[in-house]
A protein has these predicted regions:
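A metal-dependent, Asp-based hydrolase signature
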Residues: 43-74
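Short, acidic loop-to-helix structural element flanking the phosphoryl-transfer center
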Residues: 71-101
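Substrate-recognition "cap/lid" segment bordering the active-site pocket of phosphatases
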Residues: 108-138
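Hydrophobic alpha-helical core bundles mediating ligand binding, dimerization, or RNAP-core interactions
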Residues: 20-21, 56-61, 73-77, 110-114
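Generic structural signal for small/hydrophobic residues in well-ordered secondary structure
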Residues: 7-10, 49, 94, 102, ...
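A structural micro-motif
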Residues: 2, 98, 122-125
Length: 138
């Protein structure tokens, strides 16, 4: 039996931040790319468990001069994760003959969303999340 390790972001899940960026712009923010946002918040702190989801959302909200509903912001933040159906099907097929493990740099909000929408733990024997481990994968 072979062990197979999948990264979650940009492998099993695509990143599509348009809704988040649009929400920020609608409230006076100037972010044009996801990198514009992540370079101005403590994403590493969030993805290593030192900054919880609500604190991260407050940091993102501060990027726009006009107030943003935390509910709308959270929905836009998690909505950027889009499951890649073909890759999830591949992981499912491989899991029938191999041991599958998942690695991810993720925070609590994204993980809760992925578990609800995709049920990623069903694809793997184990998952190593950066926010639980306290360190980021390379």
């Amino acid at each position: 039996m072979v062990d197979i390790v999948f990264d979650i972001g940009r492998v099993l899940v695509a990143l599509q931040p348009e809704r988040l960026l649009g929400l920020l712009r609608a409230h006076g923010g100037v972010a044009r790319t996801l990198e514009d946002v992540t370079s101005r918040i403590d994403l590493t702190g969030h993805e290593t468990g030192r900054v919880d989801g609500m604190q991260l959302l407050q940091q993102i909200a501060a990027l726009a001069p006009e107030p943003i509903s935390m509910t709308a912001l959270q929905e836009a933040w998690v909505d950027m994760l889009r499951p890649e159906a073909t890759m999830l099907q591949l992981a499912d097929r491989l899991s029938r003959r191999h041991r599958i493990f998942l690695l991810t740099n993720v925070g609590d909000l994204h993980w809760a969303y992925l578990e609800q929408v995709v049920g990623l733990h069903h694809y793997a024997m184990d998952v190593l999340r950066s926010d639980v481990a306290g360190v980021m994968k390379p």
